[in-house]
Amino acid sequence: MGHAPDTTLGRLYKEHIRLILAKDIDALLDQYTQDALLISSFSADRKPVYFRGRDQLREHFQGILGLKNLEVDIAFWAESENPTTLMIVEAVKVVDNKGESSTMRFADSWVLKDGKIAIHFAGMVQYPDGSLA
């Protein structure tokens, strides 16, 4: 396992994580196109939730920005050009505002347009209770 490579997408990803930890939602949203689509499986019923545009993305990120700590270990990294696309699997450890820690696995995929994230699939692969998606 490891870290993001020193590529354009690797640097964008590192900045993405840095902005989450810094709780800088405006700068985080600036990484996305105005009409971006984020599909998330971070829901209590484990059904997909669709966030379109920056106002809805802001809603999604409010929950993530409430984390006290976030550690990411990349298990899989793949990127391509034309279109610029990223696919990663991450082992994630978080500490929430109550001080409770959780370990999960995510699968994230980005499709970029003009250097910004246009489509983001944020999928939970392994939930905090250890169950698989």
Predicted regions and their residues:
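Short beta-strand edge/turn micro-motifs at domain boundaries
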Residues: T103-A133
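A solvent-exposed, acidic/Ser-Thr-rich amphipathic alpha-helical stretch
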Residues: D6, I25-T84
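Short, low-complexity N-terminal intrinsically disordered segments enriched in polar/charged residues
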Residues: M1-D30, Q34-D35, L132-A133
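Short beta-strand segments enriched in hydrophobic/aromatic residues
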Residues: Y32-T33, E90-V94, G123-M124
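Short, cysteine-centered beta-strand-loop-beta hairpins and adjacent loop/turn segments enriched
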Residues: L67, K93-T103
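Hydrophobic/aromatic beta-strand elements that line small-molecule binding cavities or substrate pockets
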Residues: I74-A78, A91-K93, R105-V111
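Short solvent-exposed loop/turn micro-motifs enriched in small/polar/acidic residues
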Residues: R11, L70-E71, S101-M104
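A short hydrophobic beta-strand element
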Residues: N82-V92
